[in-house]
Each structure stands twice: as C-alpha cells, then as structure tokens.
Amino acid sequence: MATKTVRIEQIGSPIRREASQRATLIGLKLNKLHRVSELEDTPSVRGMIRKVAHLVRVLDDAAA
C-alpha cells in the first residue's frame, strides 16, 4: 500500500522570522526559496505546514 504524500514549496524567506519558524522549515526539508519537498502526509507534517503556512505553498494535496 502506497503512503500518501504532500508536496510543498517554500515561497517566503525565513529572514527576520522566529527561530522556531526557521527550525520548522528545516524540519520540512526546505531551506531556500522555490525549493520543493515531498513528505509523507501525517498529522505532524500537517501541523508543521500550518505553523509556517505564510512561508510555504502546498502543491499536491492528495497524491497516492
């Protein structure tokens, strides 16, 4: 059974953001603008995306 994944792209800079937001971007495997990361769709990843929603964009919501 294939696990669901979510693709996200960084669209905002972490400059002048709180350290926790910078750490969240690193946890999402993002570090530069317009980089795309594909992660397993879990509640913890969704929470991290919600925390930095102003800095990222979800590209594919449901990919199996």
From Swiss-Prot:
Pfam families: Ribosomal_L30. GO terms for molecular function: structural constituent of ribosome. Gene3D superfamilies: Ribosomal protein L30, ferredoxin-like fold domain. Keywords: Ribonucleoprotein, Ribosomal protein. The keyword Ribonucleoprotein applies. One of its GO terms (cellular component) is cytosolic large ribosomal subunit. SUPFAM superfamilies: Ribosomal protein L30p/L7e. One of its GO terms (biological process) is translation. HAMAP family: Ribosomal_uL30_B. NCBIfam families: rpmD_bact (TIGR01308). Belongs to the universal ribosomal protein uL30 family. Part of the 50S ribosomal subunit. This is Large ribosomal subunit protein uL30. It comes from Methylorubrum populi (strain ATCC BAA-705 / NCIMB 13946 / BJ001).
